[in-house]
Amino acid sequence: LSSRTPHCSGFPATVSCCRAGSAPSEPGAWFALQVPGNFDSPSHTLMRGLAESESWSGRLTGVLRHDVVGEAAEYLRIMLDAGCDADAWETTYLQLLPGENAVLEWVRGAGLRPVLAALSPEEARVFEAEYSARLAEAYPPSVHGTVFPFRRIFAVARKRE
């Protein structure tokens, strides 16, 4: 599954392999997922807040999603409703990121891409400077690096025999 699309709207079809009597999967078939669950963390709320600010909303309205993935309980319910034996859980990894602007560098890998794509190079530079200042307050660096809590959601399902 991709964390760039709303999961739970199309997720039941994805898990259809677990529905009793559905072809071509066999009883005992497994389905597993892991997705980032950090869309309510400061790295993302600060990005959305800045994008929604008076300075940026004209260019960035609708660019960032608020509900990118579901919660572990939602995935569990969908899998159980599909006739699977299932389990779901979450873990928060404390990533130690090296370097200056470590969290900004991290979110450039995926979360910040839609913003940067919607802006001119000069606008992107200004946005990143404002965003970086906010991130520095939320994620202060230490002599060891910058601690970045990264929540992941996991779920597994097995088609009932």
Q: PLM features: residue spans?
A:
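A short SAM/SAH-binding and catalytic strip from SAM-dependent methyltransferases
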Residues: 1-15, 37
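Loop/helix-junction capping segments adjacent to catalytic residues or to phosphate/diphosphate-binding pockets
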Residues: 11, 40-42, 69, 97
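Generic recognition of short, well-ordered alpha-helical segments
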Residues: 15-19, 45, 98, 102
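A short glycine-rich, Lys/Arg-flanked "PGG" loop and its adjoining helix->strand segment in the class I
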Residues: 15-30
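Residues within well-ordered alpha helices
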Residues: 25-27, 50, 54, 78, ...
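Conserved class I S-adenosyl-L-methionine
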Residues: 30-57
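Conserved Class I S-adenosyl-L-methionine
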Residues: 63-161
